[in-house]
UniProtKB/Swiss-Prot annotation:
Binds 1 zinc ion per subunit. Endopeptidase that degrades various components of the extracellular matrix, such as fibrin. May be involved in the activation of membrane-bound precursors of growth factors or inflammatory mediators, such as tumor necrosis factor-alpha. May also be involved in tumoral process. Cleaves pro-TNF-alpha at the '74-Ala-|-Gln-75' site. Not obvious if able to proteolytically activate progelatinase A. Does not hydrolyze collagen types I, II, III, IV and V, gelatin, fibronectin, laminin, decorin nor alpha1-antitrypsin. It comes from Homo sapiens. This is Matrix metalloproteinase-17. Residues 1-35 form the signal peptide. Its cofactor is Zn(2+); Ca(2+). Keywords: Calcium, Cell membrane, Cleavage on pair of basic residues, Disulfide bond, Extracellular matrix, Glycoprotein, GPI-anchor, Hydrolase, Lipoprotein, Membrane, Metal-binding, Metalloprotease, Protease, Repeat, Secreted, Signal, Zinc, Zymogen.
């Protein structure tokens, strides 16, 4: 049974004098208090109130401002609007304009509303009938290109081609580029107000939008904010990934609206790169939605002319000229602060960054992602973590740094954190590693040459600990990281090497230690410091074979992430249809599950 913090009663119902008040005042009253007996929470700042009201109206949660009524709202309507936004965004549904809600409102996103926009005259929503193209062959062209971008015209066109191909690969739609002025899908890079009713707002905020199919002159047109720093395989892990945003917007252009499903490409918030354009596949629920509109693509039309795919990436002299950030580590020449299996995937943390491997050990990106952009709620000044693990009792993720720890539900920090590590009966000073051993379902914490055994189900430390390391013969007495993997084995990391202990065993498997960089992070022997000679196949006992590069995917000296780390897929790993590929989303708790807002939300 989950332990939940006690919660007071909700806000009291409004009395006659509160039933209708000007919205800013009502926000202060409704959002500054959590319960009738609780102490008032800090009142939102005036600029936050203004942001909240404008944002909720802009994206369909509240009617737009009406000067004839003074924009009056009831407390109930306002609380419902905030609750709906929180549910759609994967936050705890409190109905309160708290810090997490404001942070999500400030996250870059698509310009289109999440819900059918309300009006003052009609407060009941009626979901519009889905629109779709009544033809199968659609033309497209890039009418205007980004003006001050390191991405060349050919790269932009290539990214548009592959983003459209994501949809035509599974649905009976054929996209072809045209050079003339007439095209079904016109693509523009614009700034500020560009006369379509969806003005852009500078860097961040709204980054792009597209129009649904129909008979209007803008049907299918797709616009990107030219004030954004558009990137592709950026070396500094910053900017807006153009391919990821384009896939989302072209979903609108063929008729799909926003959804709250956790790993859908059609969630409204920007979540970062989605991987290699030549290998990216849509999450399952997005496939189902487009199949419902157009049916399943069975074969290529015999009358369709073959179109030569553009090359990716572009030559080196047309890539980003921005210097790489000095604090970004290289995966092939470092040890890691923490390693964890989360939702069946491997996360390697170093400094403010992390790398991610899917269930079948595909490296999502050769470049690391920023930790704070993925795990919402970690302090911005946090420059590293000590240990991370996923609790087996409730599948929440625990981060440790020094004397404090944080608990996350999916990508969002739980209320009330950070808390002291003394909650675990651990001494002050932090830990070196943490992992849950599959053999006994206990969590082990390591510090220097000591280890503790903890029961996450009862939230108590087992008696008799700490004990002297190591429990497993052959494992170093001091560790950097530890993790259990989907194959049932436990993996221990120190420096640039790792040790493998098979499920239920108390000693290291033969042939270890081996190179972490080579076997997990797709580094060659010449790249990984301290790498060792190849061993036999993992099925025979020692380690997995070295990672493999797809040789056809190295172009113009530019390393492309179509790579697989050493081991074959663990038993029961999902196939490519259900494996989550978006960099900034957690996969579902069970393979193939449609992880909807009612279950566990995170875009």
């Amino acid at each position: 049974m989950r332990r939940r913090a006690a919660r007071g009663p909700g806000p009291p119902p409004p009395g006659p004098g509160l039933s209708r008040l000007p919205l800013p005042l009502l926000l202060l009253l409704a959002l500054g208090t959590r319960g009738g007996c609780a102490a008032p929470a800090p009142a939102p700042r005036a600029e936050d109130l203004s942001l909240g009201v404008e944002w909720l109206s802009r994206f369909g949660y509240l009617p737009p401002a009406d000067p004839t009524t003074g924009q009056l709202q009831t407390q109930e309507e306002l609380s419902k609007a905030i609750t709906a936004m929180q549910q759609f965004g994967g936050l705890e549904a409190t109905g309160i304009l708290d810090e997490a809600t404001l942070a999500l409102m400030k996250t870059p996103r698509c310009s289109l509303p999440d819900l059918p926009v309300l009006t003052q005259a009609r407060r009941r929503r009626q979901a519009p009938a889905p629109t779709k193209w009544n033809k199968r062959n659609l033309s497209w062209r890039v009418r205007t290109f980004p003006r001050d971008s390191p991405l060349g015209h050919d790269t932009v066109r290539a990214l548009m081609y592959y983003a459209l191909k994501v949809w035509s690969d599974i649905a009976p739609l054929n996209f072809h580029e045209v050079a003339g002025s007439a095209a079904d899908i016109q693509i523009d890079f614009s700034k500020a107000d560009h006369n379509d009713g969806y003005p852009f707002d500078g860097p961040g905020g709204t980054v792009a939008h597209a129009f649904f199919p129909g008979h209007h002159h803008t049907a299918g047109d797709t616009h990107f904010d030219d004030d954004e720093a558009w990137t592709f395989r950026s070396s500094d892990a910053h900017g807006m990934d153009l391919f990821a945003v384009a896939v989302h917007e072209f979903g609108h252009a063929i008729g799909l609206s926003h959804v709250a499903a956790a790993h859908s490409i059609m969630r409204p918030y920007y979540q970062g790169p989605v991987g290699d354009p030549l290998r990216y596949g849509l999450p399952y629920e997005d496939k189902v939605r487009v199949w419902q509109l157009y049916g399943v693509r069975e074969s290529v039309s015999p009358t369709a002319q073959p179109e030569e795919p553009p090359l990716l990436p572009e030559p080196p002299d047309n890539r980003s000229s921005a210097p790489p950030r000095k604090d970004v580590p290289h995966r092939c020449s470092t040890h890691f602060d923490a390693v964890a299996q989360i939702r069946g995937e491997a996360f390697f943390f170093k400094g403010k960054y992390f790398w991610r491997l899917t269930r079948d050990r595909h490296l999502v990106s050769l470049q690391p992602a920023q930790m704070h952009r993925f795990w919402r709620g970690l302090p911005l000044h946090l420059d590293s973590v000590d240990a991370v693990y996923e609790r087996t009792s409730d599948h929440k993720i625990v981060f440790f740094k020094g004397d404090r720890y944080w608990v996350f539900k999916d990508n969002n920090v739980e209320e009330g954190y950070p808390r002291p590590v003394s909650d675990f009966s651990l001494p002050p000073g932090g830990i070196d590693a943490a992992f849950s051993w599959a053999h006994n379902d206990r969590t082990y914490f390591f510090k220097d040459q000591l280890y503790w055994r903890y029961d996450d189900h009862t939230r108590h430390m087992d008696p008799g600990y700490p004990a002297q390391s190591p429990l497993w013969r052959g494992v170093p007495s001091t560790l950097d990281d530890a993790m259990r993997w989907s194959d049932g084995a436990s993996y221990f990391f120190r420096g640039q090497e790792y040790w493998k202990v098979l499920d239920g065993e108390l000693e290291v498997a033969p042939g270890y230690p081996q190179s972490t960089a080579r076997d997990w992070l797709v580094c060659g022997d010449s790249q990984a410091d301290g790498s060792v000679a190849a061993g036999v196949d993992a099925a025979e006992g020692p380690r997995a074979p070295p990672g493999q590069h797809d040789q056809s995917r190295s172009e113009d000296g530019y390393e492309v992430c179509s790579c697989t780390s050493g081991a074959s897929s663990p038993p029961g790993a999902p196939g490519p249809l259900v494996a989550a590929t978006m960099l900034l989303l957690l996969p579902p708790l069970s393979p193939g599950a449609l992880w909807t807002a009612a279950q566990a939300l995170t875009l």
